[in-house]
Design a protein with these regions (language model features):
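Exposed aromatic-hydrophobic patches
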Residues: 89-92, 124-132
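Cysteine-rich micro-motifs
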Residues: 54-65
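Short, flexible, mixed-charge glycine/proline-rich loop motifs
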Residues: 30-37, 49-53, 130-131
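Residues immediately within or flanking Cys/His clusters that coordinate Zn2+
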Residues: 40, 57, 137
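Cys/His-rich microdomains that often coordinate metals
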Residues: 49-50, 64-65, 144
Length: 150
């Protein structure tokens, strides 16, 4: 495709280059930026964790990343949430070895998004200041994203 034509099409259609080439337009329906509607992305190549307040076309290491779909946890991936003096303390008995571990936990309310990164051979524990009701997300490097409302 000619650069002039590409540039003209991008300006006229108001889309990004990846949107133009893929034929899929990304429309952010979360104009109010309610952070409970956040999208999380994880790069399968380098492990980067990316957060967007709404729909976005995200790429890392040359790969276009799909938004993660959060699931209800099974028994092996459940976390314990304790409410201790204005804080949520979360912990998990999930394996934390180099090949299978929890990568992060994120606490999301209407106006705040806080992420704590975990590392292999470390502890899967985090503290978040409690700011009302929200959603807790956590990510297993093998089985994906899980959530629990609080």
């Amino acid at each position: 495709m000619d650069n002039y034509v590409t540039g003209t099409a991008i300006r006229t259609l108001r889309v990004s280059v990846p949107e133009l080439l893929s034929g899929e337009q990304v429309i952010n329906v979360n104009r109010a930026a309610n952070l409970r509607r956040s999208r999380l992305y994880v790069c399968p190549v380098c492990g980067n964790v990316l957060h967007a307040a709404g729909s976005a076309m995200i790429s890392c290491c040359g790969v276009t990343l799909p938004p993660l779909e959060a699931e209800q946890p099974d028994e092996a991936h459940d976390v314990r949430i304790e409410d201790i003096e204005h804080e949520l303390y979360i912990s998990s008995a999930h394996p934390m070895n180099k090949s299978h571990y929890l990568s992060f936990a994120a606490c999301c309310t209407d106006d705040r998004f806080e992420l704590v990164r975990f590392y292999p051979e470390g502890n899967a524990e985090a503290r978040f200041f409690r700011r009302g009701h929200g959603i807790l997300y956590w990510y297993c490097n093998r089985h994906g994203l899980f959530f629990k409302r609080f």
